[in-house]
Amino acid sequence: MAASTSTSTFPGMRERRPSTSAPISELQGPVGPGFSRPKHKRTFTGFGAGEIKNVEASIPEPQREAWKKFAPHGFKNKEDFEKEVVRHVETTLARSMFNCDETAAYAAASLAFRDRLITEWNRTQQRQTFADSKRIYYLSLEFLMGRALDNAMLNVGLKNVAKEGLSDLGFRIEDIINQEHDAALGNGGLGRLAACFLDSMASLNYPAWGYGLRYRYGIFKQEIVDGYQVEVPDYWLDFNPWEFPRHDIVVDIQFYGHVRKYQDAQGVSKVSWEGGEIVKAVAYDVPVPGFDTATTNNLRLWSSKAASGEFDFQKFNSGDYESSVADQQRAETISAVLYPNDNLDRGKELRLKQQYFWVAASLYDIVRRFKKSKRAWTEFSDQVAIQLNDTHPTLAIVELQRILIDQEGLEWDEAWSIVSQTFGYTNHTVLPEALEKWSVPLFQNLLPRHLQIIYEINLLFLQSVERKFPNERDLLSRVSIIEESQPKMVRMAFLAIVGSHKVNGVAELHSDLIKTTIFRDFVKVFGPDKFTNVTNGITPRRWLHQANPRLSELIASKTGGSLGFLKDLNNLNELEKYVDDKEFKKEWAEIKYANKVRLAKHIQTTTGVTVNPAALFDIQVKRIHEYKRQQMNIFGVIHRYLTIKSMTPAERKKLAPRVSIFGGKAAPGYWMAKTIIHLINSVGAVVNNDKDVGDLLKVIFLEDYNVSKAEIIIPASDISEHISTAGTEASGTSNMKFVLNGGLIIGTCDGANIEITHEIGENNIFLFGNLAEDVEDLRHAHNYGSHTLDPDLSAVFEAIKKNTFGDANSFGALVGAIEEHGDYYLVSDDFHSYNQTQALVDEAYKNQDEWLTKCITSVARMGFFSSDRCINEYAESIWNIEPLIPGQSGGSGMQKGEL
């Protein structure tokens, strides 16, 4: 691969010789009479730590003073903010007071805050470079960031300034915030976890970079048409003021081709990957501000571009108009969409291509930055920690090994020692079928050199296993990175384990399960110390302060009068003093009701259905998947509907009204998940128009669920559903968000539900269903023994089969999966317990005083689930990095940040 850099020369200019006062390879020209300042040849990563000190000293004092004098400092009051907004309206957007609408006002306000952030971003990069400290690089295929403007306002502490300033200019801040499209860089919990981690890394002042892909159309925008999910492009990049194109940071990424072995002039055997296709990776940077700190870290996203350019003029002139742009269109598909449909072979190739494109560009960037330090390669893992968020970036292990042996000339063992001390791997699944695998023929065609390296890694690993366990031949096949199937497959999770120094799960149950099930053999090979647990967390800045500002203010008033609890969430335990305070509980209830009114208005606006804010709001919003069991939820709703229909009017008056709210996307190729969405909407169409039922039950599906919608939905929850089959959900984080906002949980003993129960107490959560240790026996009984359906579930299926909710054939596969095909996710086994527990929820909700006590107690005990705690654990036990606090580490006066 090669990087393109920007330099220019002009005839007649004096030749510039390397400066003796600033002995830097990338500097050109002496300092002195006739020279204004050293000229820096643009590189990927700016100056190294030693270089930045030398170059600062080489700049004449008057020039340094001029740069310091005129350096931007960012607005701090309403007047300066208004000045910045008006300036951007008139000079950046070419508008005026007379044609500045809300979209333009959003753009100008965003640009004003962006300018402020980028000033701190520059200083942060200078500070981190000057300190020459170890960095963490977080590789995630998803970063579900949500809206940036509101987050920036709150993190820099100037939302009230912006609110007043926008009001002076004739705008409501709420209207301006709502103009922003969510950044479509993720789908579910994986991406939101990565976003929370970026927030915490910046807020805790850790030197950190995120690396991802800049998806042109996101995963997709979900529309519901006639009850069905329809995927359309998400044009979120139409205006995005939060990114900085780095057109001078371009990396050539190679695909296909062949491997040539040869001997160099010294007779040393060499390997060269040659031929094939080149695609350019172009960098886009997004500033990530910390809360109540000057630290502003970086998220670097890669966009794909044709190496030959966007347009072939020769083909166009010859009349071949389609081919003239074909190369660019083919290249752009790599970063067009998150998770391309992989039901087809071309989709599989595109996914693997996407993953390599991203990790290769990121590794090139990381290695270039390290080489600036002029350190020995043996110090690489002392300066660089790379965390793999799931198996998607696992190719980074192979790519770093390739760089070290093929390009840097290291011996295999030395290179592998560096690689295996650099990476950490976070596993996010306990489902064997969810562990990523790629076919060997696909690898051979797309990445021939990497397949060779994988085979070599596997051979050396298996040889070490055989030496350690000489009489266990079966163990070799069980731990082999190459699965001996037809075709052979590369097991990416196994590669990640072998190439990482630490492997962590994301909840106590999950970490225990992976050690006793899917990775049991690796615990035997490597020992238990390689495996650890870091329970997931969420950032309270977005999920409490931003999503639920009134509750945040109320909590602040009871925890010392400041927002300190947002940086130390354990301060929430002060709230337990007020569980019997009537005035406090009254204000708490008023805030919850106001949030429910806000959600009810959103439901009315988006679906046309009117719901009663006084009803119990029962919410399940997350990625649609059979293991998350939205199907059990909607079957429970149908059971409730049938029960209401069978009641007399007098009996119905005793019922607590309920609104069942669903949201989430199904993968485009996941037909069963799409069927669940169709059933939810079909049930809603019947129930919401049944006059016998009225307000006693409403069924709502909110389309295109995303972070900004979650900020409306989660604070309004009374009960939220986290009902995955026990042992299938690694952690989950939406459960934490709901509880932090004063909602209770109905859930199984799975993922983080267990640890939430440990923290808040069994009396404050509604648990049901079988335990993880029972699951395999139940599945065996389904397939080889008796499988009797719960009578209530049978009645639900009968109603579906009678076309109560539309054509029964549309839902035949969903019902058949339970009745005839083994009920893999144990809906039938847990359905009775689920309904009984829902009845307990109904009863508990009637006693509002006791319900509020449960809610307040739960929030008070949620301090453990901050992503700040999570990141500190990673930093200490896996990454071995230290925070770099502004003002405590010295710094540079330079105004050119390291890129």
Please annotate each region the language model reported:
Residues 2-899:
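A conserved ligand/cofactor-binding region detector
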